[in-house]
Amino acid sequence: MSKISEVVQRARAAFNSGKTRPLQFRIQQLEALRRMIKEHEKDLAGALTADLHKNEWNAYYEEVVYVLEEIEYMIKKLPEWAADEPVEKTPQTQQDECYIHSEPLGVVLIIGTWNYPFTVTIQPMVGAIAAGNAVVIKPSELSENMANLLATIIPQYLDRDLYPVISGGIPETTELLKERFDHILYTGNTAVGKVIMMAAAKHLTPVTLELGGKNPCYVDKDCDLDIACRRIAWGKFMNSGQTCVAPDYILCDPSIQNQIVEKLKKALKEFYGEDAKKSRDYGRIINSRHFQRVMGLMEGQKVAYGGTGDAATRYIAPTILIDVDTQSQVMQEEIFGPVMPIVCVRSLEEAIQFINQREKPLALYVFSLNDKMIKKMIAETSSGGVTANDVIVHVSVHSLPYGGVGNSGMGSYHGKKSFETFSHCRSCLVRPLLNDESLKTRYPPSLAKMTRH
């Protein structure tokens, strides 16, 4: 038996012992996780700085705070969510007790990713712990400083058998996927998501896949362009564009393209100064391979702003592309970098058609003062989530499920949805062992009963 198999088997044995069943145990583990985060805030920030050039402020407000809020929300709501839920009865079951009982699935595997290596690894773990599962954590090896830190500190605070951390790269993940889990949650790209799903199918293991896509951002002529562009620039260029729900490209009328460029430039200079490379708030690309990939997407494009990079530091300047050919590579794959293409459309209907001709995105954004236009965009398109007149913030609302649709993923989590994702809703009926006379019509022989109808 391999070391990874031993770790998974220990987690299953610990789960089978029943120790996760009591709510008090789950809450104690969540409280320990909260304590771990608060006592290691500086270490977490240091790892994020080393991996992605995030400063302490960005590390806290882009990652740590969301997990702390999720833990508080879970602890507060867990007794309510875990309680048996009575359901409506049929005429034949009026004397019975009918309810839904939430039970843990078993051993859950969470495979994190590198762009928000703390949040996307630990936030789903919060829900899995709350639901009473054992959780095997596999951080991304690309954000190696965060991966090493989590492998060090998690065993110091949480039950070591129930919540192990597996370090390593593709070989270790491949070995993990040979094991039988009761649920797998993966965050990453669509190609790997398909590999995860194929591996899970061998054991009929359900999956939650948080993938990606090209998130459209439609800007109506009838809106405050200063506010719109400031909000778009914030969401697009935070973490150097390496955010799965960042706006990937802008759709707008040709008449406002130049205004959008100028207002984006103004916002970028406000955020990061004349030279973003010198800004403590501006991130870096995770590694050289991704640096080369993003730089390659700009080849042959009309650059209105930025377009430069430094391979030695993996810095790519905030970049705006105009008059973009929709058949070019930059419009065929998720950019996942600080490059914003602008595509011109002449109407809302054309924008909707453009969006619907492509794979369903993880997020969709629309800026307009016209509520009917916003409702039309929502009604006639499909995406994992929507924010109108801002970007990204729907992900921060614990009561809204976070997930994709189609090529951008399946399943969702956050808040109550996390508890539901990592629970089995068990249908329960408890009948009194009395008054069998009322059930006599169901018993054979049936011939005499049939002649009466």
Swiss-Prot record:
Annotated EC: 1.2.1.5
Keywords per UniProt: Acetylation, Cytoplasm, Lipid metabolism, NAD, NADP, Oxidoreductase
Keyword Electron transport: no
GO CC, alphabetical: cytoplasm
Keyword Oxidoreductase: yes
Swiss-Prot/TrEMBL GO biological process terms: aldehyde metabolic process; lipid metabolic process
GO MF annotations in UniProt: aldehyde dehydrogenase (NAD+) activity
Residues the record marks as active site: E210, C244
Annotated signal sequence range: none
Record-listed N-acetylserine modification sites: S2
Stretches of the chain forming a coiled coil according to its record: none
Enzyme class: oxidoreductase
Positions bearing N6-acetyllysine: K178, K194
Annotated positions binding NAD(+): G188, N189, T190, A191, V192, G193
Pfam families membership: Aldedh (PF00171)
Subcellular location as annotated: Cytoplasm
Reactions catalysed according to its record: an aldehyde + NAD(+) + H2O = a carboxylate + NADH + 2 H(+); octanal + NAD(+) + H2O = octanoate + NADH + 2 H(+)
Role summary: ALDHs play a major role in the detoxification of alcohol-derived acetaldehyde. They are involved in the metabolism of corticosteroids, biogenic amines, neurotransmitters, and lipid peroxidation. Oxidizes medium and long chain aldehydes into non-toxic fatty acids. Preferentially oxidizes aromatic aldehyde substrates. Comprises about 50 percent of corneal epithelial soluble proteins. May play a role in preventing corneal damage caused by ultraviolet light.
Family per similarity comment: Belongs to the aldehyde dehydrogenase family.
Subunit structure, as described in the record: Homodimer.
Name the UniProt record assigns to this protein: Aldehyde dehydrogenase, dimeric NADP-preferring
Organism annotation: Canis lupus familiaris
Phylogenetic lineage: Eukaryota, Metazoa, Chordata, Craniata, Vertebrata
